[in-house]
Design a protein with these regions (language model features):
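Anion-binding alpha/beta catalytic cores of soluble intermediary-metabolism enzymes, centered on
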Residues: 1-49, 53-238, 243-314
Length: 314
């Protein structure tokens, strides 16, 4: 086991215990997206349904030496049609997961959020990075760094709840510790994120957010480092040992996630929640292990939802 990726390796091994889930891959028309889907299938994580221009997908596979003969292809003329086809498969119950291929995130999300034909639910849609940071002994969830640009307090309630629900799937034996981040750990009327952090914590106390332990505002250092929390004399079950970092806005979250990736050798698996099915958002810069981990996370979420639905009707 590669110690740098040991947390991802454990997730992938756990996922292999389940049946592979049908996954609609939207426009896998370059090597990285097609190879990621094929290798995830070879590891037993997903059963890909390739949505895109048939001839173009076949050419990429031939050029890269990838065998896609056993995978279904849903022919779609262009990237917009590929996104719509993948979403349609999810709506029809033929796919339990949707994966982004070589199209722009906005193209896929436009199909996802369509009020008539998309995958909306009563929840706010949000994104979670599931990060394997070598310096930490646990997987770290960062939200929201990709979908909600300037979320309101109301938006953040769903963002936090989506992240807690994800953490409980990944670690059912551990109550998630949620740090609501700001630039400081005291409430300052001049810094709106500190007021929202305090409000979210009170909402959790009142049962408006469930399943996790919340604390905030917390600065990044005293959210993830026990020594920093002790120096600041912050006494809470979250400080220094957060599993989830809730950022004030997309800009802060994106910079935090990319800083960990490019300066701390972390890998970032990405998943969108608050939709009918989990959606894997990958980047062309993602490593293969990050792509596989994204598939594993989405597969575990899909399996948990399937088990919950079965329990509800039994």
């Amino acid at each position: 086991m590669d110690r740098r990726h040991e947390k991802y390796d454990r997730l992938i091994e756990r996922c292999k215990q389940n049946e592979p889930v049908p996954c609609a891959v939207a426009h896998p028309c370059d090597e990285s997206s097609l190879r990621g889907a094929v290798e995830a299938a070879q590891m037993g994580l997903i059963v890909p349904i390739l949505c895109g221009p048939r001839a173009r997908i076949a050419k990429v596979a031939a050029d890269c030496g990838l065998d896609i003969s056993r995978f279904e292809i849903v022919d779609a003329e262009h990237s917009h049609a590929s996104a719509e086809a993948a979403v349609r498969l999810a709506r029809e119950g033929k796919a339990a997961v949707v994966m982004k291929g070589s199209l722009h995130t906005d193209e896929l999300m436009a199909a996802v959020v369509n009020r008539d034909t998309g995958l909306r639910t009563s929840r706010r849609i949000s994104h979670c990075f599931v990060m394997d940071v070598p310096a930490l002994d646990r997987v770290l969830i960062i939200t929201d760094a990709a979908v909600n640009i300037f979320p309101t307090l109301e938006d953040k309630v769903d963002i936090v709840q989506n992240a807690i629900d994800l953490a409980l799937v990944l670690r059912p034996d551990r109550q998630p510790r949620v740090a609501i981040l700001s630039a400081m750990e005291t409430v300052n009327p001049k810094v709106p994120s500190t007021i929202e952090a305090a409000a979210l914590c009170k909402m959790a106390e009142r049962g408006q957010i469930t399943g996790g332990l919340l604390d905030g505002p917390l600065a990044l250092d005293n959210a993830v480092d026990l020594a920093a929390a002790k120096i600041k004399k912050i006494d809470s079950p979250v400080a220094g040992q957060a599993d989830i970092l809730v950022v004030p806005d997309l800009e802060a979250g994106n910079m935090l996630a990319k800083s960990l990736t490019f300066m701390a050798e972390a890998d970032a698996a990405g998943i969108v929640l608050g939709t009918r099915v989990p959606i894997i958002l990958t980047s062309r810069a993602d490593s293969l292990i990050a792509r596989l981990a994204s598939c594993a996370v989405a597969s575990l979420v899909a399996a948990a939802r399937r088990a919950q639905a079965t329990k509800a009707v039994s």
